């Protein structure tokens, strides 16, 4: 009897203790929450050294081959010049663009061209391996866009827009170039700029990947010339013009 009574008293005491703890928890529910959950979420399981904490550059740059094996088209996934183009055939011409200057500092880069949403880089010769050049080009482009610097510091016209002084034939040539021909050439990483129209001959300047492309003459004759002659009977032919002596030497070299 005594043992049974003691067991009953013990059970009652335990039950009373549980009731007090339960009531205390109901009155103070936060006593069981020793640390907010978000502190566990934000706390790294394996703390890294301070040297590893740095801004991460989120940029995926695609590359696209061009008809010119020495030119490669880099697509950063964001606008470059949007609706126009700029050509930098030599390092001296790159004074207008901080990015072009940085790209020319990479050994083996011959010329740089900016399109609406791409950057065309041309290497000096076929012996240079793109696999050796591309890492430096990727890093230069990513660093520049992360810096927030302006792409160009001096505005220059990229082509010859139509004006009121143009006659009907010249206006038609420029419109056809802008709407049908230039977009196609830009897809290959280059551009074509109107320079003049005289005695039935349309004078054009090729830029970007088209400058030193082995098939540039074919592009002029079979592509651009045929289209211009089809729509504009006054056009008798197309010829490529050079802006400086270096271009002329390159065109005349074997």
Curated annotation (Swiss-Prot):
Quaternary structure per UniProt?
A: Monomer and homohexamer; the apo-NFU1 is a monomer, while the holo-NFU1 is a hexamer composed of a trimer of dimer that is probably linked by some 4Fe-4S cluster. Interacts with HIRA and EPM2A/laforin. Interacts with BOLA3. Interacts with HSPA9.
One example of the protein's molecular function in GO is:
4 iron, 4 sulfur cluster binding
Keyword Translocase appears in the UniProt entry: no
Q: What is the protein's given name? A: NFU1 iron-sulfur cluster scaffold homolog, mitochondrial
NifU as annotated region, ranges: 173-241
InterPro entries cross-referenced by the UniProt entry: FSCA_dom_sf, Nfu/NifU_N, Nfu/NifU_N_sf, NIF_FeS_clus_asmbl_NifU_C
Q: Report the transit peptide positions.
A: 1-9
Q: Cite the binding residues for [4Fe-4S] cluster.
A: 210, 213
The UniProt family comment states: Belongs to the NifU family.
Summary of the function given for this chain in its UniProt record: Iron-sulfur cluster scaffold protein which can assemble [4Fe-4S] clusters and deliver them to target proteins.
Q: Name one GO cellular component term.
A: nucleus
- Give me any GO biological process, just one: protein maturation
Q: Which UniProt keywords apply?
A: Cytoplasm, Disease variant, Hereditary spastic paraplegia, Iron, Iron-sulfur, Metal-binding, Mitochondrion, Neurodegeneration, Primary mitochondrial disease, Transit peptide
Q: In which tissues is it expressed?
A: Ubiquitous. Expression in adult lung is weak compared to fetal lung.
- Subcellular compartments: Mitochondrion; Cytoplasm, Cytosol
Disease involvement: Multiple mitochondrial dysfunctions syndrome 1: A severe disorder of systemic energy metabolism, resulting in weakness, respiratory failure, lack of neurologic development, lactic acidosis, hyperglycinemia and early death. Some patients show failure to thrive, pulmonary hypertension, hypotonia and irritability. Biochemical features include severe combined deficiency of the 2-oxoacid dehydrogenases, defective lipoic acid synthesis and reduction in activity of mitochondrial respiratory chain complexes. Spastic paraplegia 93, autosomal recessive: A form of spastic paraplegia, a neurodegenerative disorder characterized by a slow, gradual, progressive weakness and spasticity of the lower limbs. Rate of progression and the severity of symptoms are quite variable. Initial symptoms may include difficulty with balance, weakness and stiffness in the legs, muscle spasms, and dragging the toes when walking. In some forms of the disorder, bladder symptoms (such as incontinence) may appear, or the weakness and stiffness may spread to other parts of the body.
Effect upon mutating residue 189 to A: Alters protein structure. Increases likelihood of existing as monomer. Decreases ability to receive a Fe/S clusters from donor proteins. Decreases delivery rates of [2Fe-2S] cluster to target proteins
- One matching Pfam family, short form? NifU
What's the superkingdom here? Eukaryota
Keyword Iron-sulfur attributed: yes
Encoding gene (name): NFU1
């Amino acid at each position: 009897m005594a043992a049974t009574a003691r067991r009953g008293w013990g059970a009652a005491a335990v039950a009373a203790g549980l009731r007090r703890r339960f009531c205390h928890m109901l009155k103070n529910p936060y006593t069981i929450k020793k640390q907010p959950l978000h502190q566990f979420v934000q706390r790294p399981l394996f703390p890294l050294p301070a040297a590893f904490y740095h801004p991460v550059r989120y940029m995926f740059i695609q590359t696209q081959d061009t008809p010119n094996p020495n030119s490669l088209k880099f697509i950063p996934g964001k606008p470059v010049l949007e609706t126009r183009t700029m050509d930098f055939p030599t390092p001296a011409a790159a004074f207008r663009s901080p990015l072009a200057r940085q790209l020319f500092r990479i050994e083996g880069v011959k010329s740089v061209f900016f399109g609406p949403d791409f950057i065309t880089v041309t290497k000096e010769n076929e012996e240079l391996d793109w696999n050796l050049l591309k890492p430096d080009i990727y890093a230069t482009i990513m660093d520049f866009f992360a810096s927030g610097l302006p792409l160009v510091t001096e505005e220059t016209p990229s082509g010859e827009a139509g004006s009121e002084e143009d006659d009907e034939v010249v206006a038609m040539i420029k419109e056809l170039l802008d709407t049908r021909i230039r977009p196609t050439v830009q897809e290959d990483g280059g551009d074509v700029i109107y320079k003049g129209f005289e005695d039935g001959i349309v004078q054009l300047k090729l830029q970007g990947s088209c400058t030193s492309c082995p098939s540039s003459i074919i592009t002029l004759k079979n592509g651009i010339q045929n289209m211009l002659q089809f729509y504009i009977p006054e056009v008798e032919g197309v010829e490529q013009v050079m802006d400086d002596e270096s271009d002329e030497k390159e065109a005349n070299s074997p």
